[in-house]
From Swiss-Prot:
The gene is MT-ND3. Belongs to the complex I subunit 3 family. Coiled coil: none annotated. This is NADH-ubiquinone oxidoreductase chain 3. Core subunit of respiratory chain NADH dehydrogenase (Complex I) which is composed of 45 different subunits. Interacts with TMEM186. Interacts with TMEM242. Its EC number is 7.1.1.2. The keyword Zinc-finger does not apply. GO terms for molecular function: NADH dehydrogenase (ubiquinone) activity.
Length: 115
């Protein structure tokens, strides 16, 4: 009975707060409130600003190689495993794939900022 009462009160309170949050902002609508916040930029301007694709590729490459650190961090704890050959082979394969990816990026001139 006590649990049912707590569940009922929580449900009613949650529903009441959701309804207040839904209807309260609609009471006083004005023009500035309806506009999106664009950090000082003109919200009616073009959304298609020029973006450097080279910067995007360097950022993605950084994220991929940064993920390497997250994958290699557990290695000191994995050394304490009984089957160290599996851990060594796995880390060697991971580092080899990353080295091949770095070599490919280098050969494709993906690491050069200027063209």
């Amino acid at each position: 009975m006590n649990m049912l009462l707590v569940l009922l009160v929580n449900s009613i309170l949650s529903l009441l707060l959701i309804l207040i949050a839904f209807w309260l902002p609609q009471l006083n609508m004005y023009n500035e409130k309806a506009n999106s916040y664009e950090c000082g930029f003109d919200p009616m301007g073009s959304a298609r600003l020029p973006f450097s694709m080279k910067f995007f590729l360097v950022a993605i490459t950084f994220l991929l190689f940064d993920l390497e650190i997250a994958l290699l961090l557990p290695l000191p704890w994995a050394i304490q495993m009984t089957n160290i050959n599996t851990m060594t082979l796995t880390s060697f394969i991971l580092i080899s794939v990353l080295a091949l990816g770095l070599a490919y990026e280098w050969l494709q001139k993906g690491l050069e900022w200027t063209e």
